[in-house]
Amino acid sequence: MKKTAIALAVALAGFATVAQAAPKDNTWYTGAKLGWSQYHDTGFYGNGYQNGIGNGPTHKDQLGAGAFLGYQANQYLGFELGYDWLGRMPYKGSVNNGAFKAQGVQLAAKLSYPIADDLDIYTRLGGMVWRADSKANYGRTGQRLSDHDTGVSPLAAVGVEYALTKNWATRLDYQFVSNIGDAGTVGARPDNTMLSLGVSYRFGQDDVVAPAPAPAPAPVVETKRFTLKSDVLFNFNKSTLKAEGQQALDQLYTQLSSMDPKDGSVVVLGYTDAVGSDQYNQKLSEQRAQSVVDYLVSKGIPSDKISARGMGEADAVTGNTCGYKSGRATKAQIVCLAPDRRVEIEVKGIKDVVTQPQG
């Protein structure tokens, strides 16, 4: 039996792959095993079990089996709860015969140590709550005896475990349980060893795939427009900035800086009213727009991000409400046409909404 155990252990070690032998931390597994169960110290005596019983061969080697449920706390420590059928051992004599059988529920700590990426050695230490049953038949007298006993015995095991895949593993296990049964009740108090080959399925071993990060939203290009009155920026019919106009542009520059205009573009649009020739008004609107650009560049706006454009008399705000058609305008008409004399600053690529300065 020892040669068989060594051969199986070597065979398992030869199947090394990259799978992990130990389950992931804080996961559960379940399995079953089948193997050879052997009883030791099987002398029968006491409480009606006379010396003549079992005067023939005692079949100490029997088929054993079991099932288990385990919890893997970490790579090195797990806990197992299992059921073992230790086998039915008949003892046969020429006249007297009988049988002894045992089964139990075990609870043990499993201590593992990896010797390869896919192979662990381990020991299990714990106890077994067992039930032992026996019966005897006396051919000469026709007497039949049967009884059972229960108790707790220490349990120890050693083994190797090999990971077939992430979820499946197999193990070779050699287990020892001492003093099963009370001799005064069931006529024997044997020890038991079981060499078994088991297979287990481990839950929760698949790698958790993190969801793909949501794509960054596409930048929203927006256009913000600021309108400054030309009468605040310039004297009538002039393109040189007044002190009051510079103060208004200082306020505007503060807001443009907070908006980070490097990420966008700035267009300064100059407008005039309809008083005067088209050619003159076009030139005046260009000069006024350029004056604003030059001042903002001097404050720190990159020159390649800002441009000037003269719009002349285009896009009049007042329309026909002021009654001016051509020629010399009255003072009242000049005052009425003031909204047409303006500078508009168009900022593209800036999403934040800001409040335009008051002129």
Swiss-Prot record:
Protein name: Outer membrane protein A
Disulfide bond sites: 322-336
Sequence repeats: 210-211, 212-213, 214-215, 216-217, 218-219
Membrane topology: Multi-pass membrane protein
Domain OmpA-like: 221-351
Gene Ontology CC: cell outer membrane; pore complex
Assembly behavior: Monomer and homodimer.
Domain remark text: The extracellular loops are most variable in sequence, and in some bacteria confer sensitivity to phage and/or colicins.
GO molecular function annotations of the record: porin activity
Residues annotated as site: Part of salt bridge gating mechanism: 80, 171
5 X 2 AA tandem repeats of A-P: region residues: 210-219
TM segment ranges: 27-37, 62-73, 77-85, 103-114, 119-127, 154-163, 168-175, 194-202
Organism: Serratia marcescens
Function: With TolR probably plays a role in maintaining the position of the peptidoglycan cell wall in the periplasm. Acts as a porin with low permeability that allows slow penetration of small solutes; an internal gate slows down solute passage.
Assigned keywords, A-Z: Cell outer membrane, Disulfide bond, Ion transport, Membrane, Porin, Repeat, Signal, Transmembrane, Transmembrane beta strand, Transport
Database matches in PROSITE patterns: OMPA_1 (PS01068), OMPA_2 (PS51123)
